[in-house]
Amino acid sequence: SGLLEPYEGQAGYDKLPVFRPCMEQNPAPEKYPFILCAGGRRPQFFHSRTYRVPWLANLEPHTLASLNPADAERLGIQDGGRLKVKTPIGERTYLAETVPGVLPGVIYIVHDDEGDQNVNDLIAADYLDPLSGFPGYRCYFCRVEPAGGAR
């Protein structure tokens, strides 16, 4: 168009976005083989105010960690059982939910604005997108293992 070309490359970034798999940034792939996808929402919890509506909160009183059934079977984790998620900066225990739609090698945890299950605490504060500065909620790295116990 002639409008943007004079400015291309001036900020020191690629002219077009380039996909970089998050596991390339993983400091220890053998120790943290899973991708942690965090910050999603459940339909009943769209805004923080809906967390405080008792009948909505009772629909799902615990934060769930969703993983592929094949991963759960391989790790010995039962649907409704407890699993532990470990990252380089911390660990949390969640109830497991097996979901065929979750890709193998990925664990999906919705955000929880209160309590000791806050998945944001598992992601390093300086793990940011280099271009936008946005936190890397959708693509961090972790280890998943059974924690014992059931719902």
Regions found by a protein language model. Name each.
Residues 52-66, 70-151:
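Long, contiguous, secondary-structure-rich segments that constitute the structural scaffold
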Residues 1-55:
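Long, low-complexity segments enriched in small/aliphatic residues
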